[in-house]
């Protein structure tokens, strides 16, 4: 993609969001134009006071100009407030929309995407980067619009009075802006690198907090601190370099070029006052306009710096939004499970890896209890992922009543699945909402029935507020066995057609395992159930047992056979 096309895409994205909130953007733009007009009118009124009211010694005219000046300053201040409020609301509205679009897109990405991207990196995209974009649409946008309109107004008024001076001002402004634009384009890569350093730090902090138990248990908190400190120092070093370059440029502009420009104006036009070819008010107007011209140039330069950062953030967001969503070719095709689940010569491998499943074929009739047994790495859990549509076979087909799974609406299909993993995730919300996952159609009575069936009702009722008790992070105020039983209750409350248990009993004690086996007897009634297990002893009651080794089906049958 060429630099021009990237720029066009960038502008297209900005205009796309602005068009959706034009009822805020257009009034905001109009107010910014009035503010720029007010900033031009103030110095002109002072010129009239010096050139007209004072020579005439007309007190009434002097007071009229003074009140006009006061009125313009007051109205400009009020308009600044209104304009900032409009653009702040615009920025909030747009960033909310971006966050909604981004989060909605994240939810539609395949599971494999989340395996490759740290949580901290995604948090940086959804929060930090979006807030920078918000700043672009509110504060930066307001400053840039006012400054650009002010510059245009200064050129216009000056050209009407002294065309030669207007051309000089325009030439100096174009030269300075060109230098600044080239300067900021050269250090754009430094901004991108600084943002990547920040994202890496957020990712490290997130990972270290998630793995705090392991770090403490192995005495590696010191190493984690050193790692984070090194990453922070790397970022600080780069940020200091960027700031040094920026401040050097801005200091040259404000402390050297600005005063030289004002002195040049005075040397050029002050003598004309002595010869009577120009009024004192006119000279002071040009000096004031000259000073006001340099200020917008400096502020535009500062805005360009922040806009570059916002552009980097928007670029990251757009890259994330461009990632292909999870395929769902069967949208609208309602799934069913009236006869069987069939694996027909299925081959599967993870990206760039060896085959995990090799020419796998088997049939699981509706309403049966099937067990998949094998050593670690034999492909058992991969079968669960394929059935959930989290991954897709490279060769062969998974058929639901003869229909390929990739031709069924995968979102609708998942609603018929009750999934219990080896380590099921519990949210930091109430036990009630953890069990029904905010499905309002699942009543509290249904939830109570489910937790009773899986024999975790006693533990839940012992909590301070029973079902209404908020769980700690990852359900830490429950034992591991209780957490797993809540996951079983979640599967039961959803009343699915298909139950998938992936090593659901491998991390629990004997008492909890006994409860789980009793729960499985209830869960399987009227449903199809597939259980992945290491130990054959945990699935003795299965209707059909499939033995995997190296991704191949090496045997199948009942326990008796």
Residue ranges and their predicted role:
Residues 71-75, 205, 283-303, 307:
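Hydrophobic transmembrane alpha-helices
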Residues 197, 220, 244, 293-320:
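Cytosolic ends of transmembrane helices, especially the final helix of ABC transmembrane type-1 domains
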Residues 336-561:
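ABC-type nucleotide-binding domain
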Residues 1-39, 54, 58-66, 83-87, ...:
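Membrane-integrated ABC transporters
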Residues 41-43, 47, 141-184, 240-284:
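A hydrophobic transmembrane-helix motif
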Residues 34-38, 42, 70, 75-87, ...:
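Hydrophobic alpha-helical membrane-associated segments
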Residues 2-4, 92, 100-124, 128-130, ...:
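Short intracellular "coupling" helices and adjacent cytoplasmic loop segments at the cytosolic face
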Residues 15, 20-23, 111-112, 128-137, ...:
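An intracellular "coupling" helix at the cytosolic face of ABC transporter transmembrane type-1 domains
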């Amino acid at each position: 993609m060429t630099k021009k096309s990237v720029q066009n895409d960038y502008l297209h994205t900005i205009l796309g969001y602005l068009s959706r909130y034009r009822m805020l953007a257009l009034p905001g733009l109009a107010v910014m134009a009035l503010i720029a007009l007010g900033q031009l009118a103030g110095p002109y009124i002072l010129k009239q006071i010096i050139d007209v009211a004072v020579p005439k010694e007309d007190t009434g005219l002097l007071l009229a100009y003074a009140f006009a000046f006061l009125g313009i300053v007051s109205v400009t201040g009020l308009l600044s407030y209104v304009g900032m409020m409009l653009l702040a609301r615009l920025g909030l509205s747009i960033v909310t929309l971006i966050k909604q679009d981004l989060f909605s897109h994240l939810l539609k990405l395949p599971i494999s995407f989340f395996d490759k991207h740290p949580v901290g990196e995604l948090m940086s995209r959804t929060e930090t980067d979006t807030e920078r974009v918000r700043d672009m649409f509110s504060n930066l946008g307001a400053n840039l619009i006012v400054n650009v309109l002010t510059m245009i107004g200064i050129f216009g008024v000056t050209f009407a009075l002294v065309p030669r001076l207007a051309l000089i001002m325009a030439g100096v402004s174009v030269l300075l802006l060109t230098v600044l634009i080239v300067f900021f384009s050269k250090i754009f890569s430094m901004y991108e690198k600084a943002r990547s350093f920040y994202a890496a730090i957020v990712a490290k902090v997130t990972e270290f907090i998630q793995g705090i138990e392991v770090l403490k248990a192995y005495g590696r908190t010191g190493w984690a601190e050193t790692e984070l400190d090194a990453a922070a120092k790397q970022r600080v070093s780069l940020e200091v370099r960027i700031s040094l370059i920026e401040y050097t440029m801005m200091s040259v502009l404000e402390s050297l070029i600005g005063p030289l420009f004002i002195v040049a104006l005075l040397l050029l036009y002050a003598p004309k006052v002595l010869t009577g070819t120009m009024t004192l008010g006119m000279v002071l107007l040009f000096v004031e306009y000259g000073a006001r011209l340099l200020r917008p140039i400096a502020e535009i330069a500062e805005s360009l710096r922040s806009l570059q950062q916002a552009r980097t953030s928007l670029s990251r967001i757009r890259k994330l939004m461009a990632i292909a969503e999870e395929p769902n070719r069967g949208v609208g095709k309602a799934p069913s499970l009236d006869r069987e689940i069939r694996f027909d010569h299925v081959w599967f491998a993870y990206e760039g890896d060896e085959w995990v499943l090799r020419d796998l074929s088997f049939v699981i009739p509706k309403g049966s209890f099937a067990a998949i047994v094998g050593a670690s790495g034999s492909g058992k859990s991969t079968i669960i992922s394929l059935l959930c549509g989290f991954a897709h076979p490279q060769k062969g087909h998974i058929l639901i009543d003869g229909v390929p799974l990739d031709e069924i609406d995968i979102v609708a299909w998942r609603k018929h699945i009750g999934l219990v993993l080896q380590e099921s995730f519990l949210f930091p919300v109430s036990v009630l909402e953890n069990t029904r996952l905010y499905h309002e159609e699942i009543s509290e009575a249904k939830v109570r029935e489910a937790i009773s069936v899986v024999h975790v009702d006693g533990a839940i009722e012992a909590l301070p507020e029973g079902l209404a008790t908020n769980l700690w992070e990852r359900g830490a105020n429950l034992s591991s066995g209780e957490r797993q039983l809540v996951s079983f209750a979640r599967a039961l409350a959803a009343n699915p057609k298909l139950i998938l248990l992936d090593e659901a009993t491998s991390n629990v004690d004997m008492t909890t395992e006994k409860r789980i086996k009793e729960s499985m007897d209830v869960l399987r009634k009227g449903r199809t159930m597939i259980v992945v297990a290491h130990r054959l002893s945990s699935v003795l009651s299965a209707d059909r047992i499939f033995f995997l080794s190296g991704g191949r089906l090496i045997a199948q049958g009942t326990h008796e056979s």
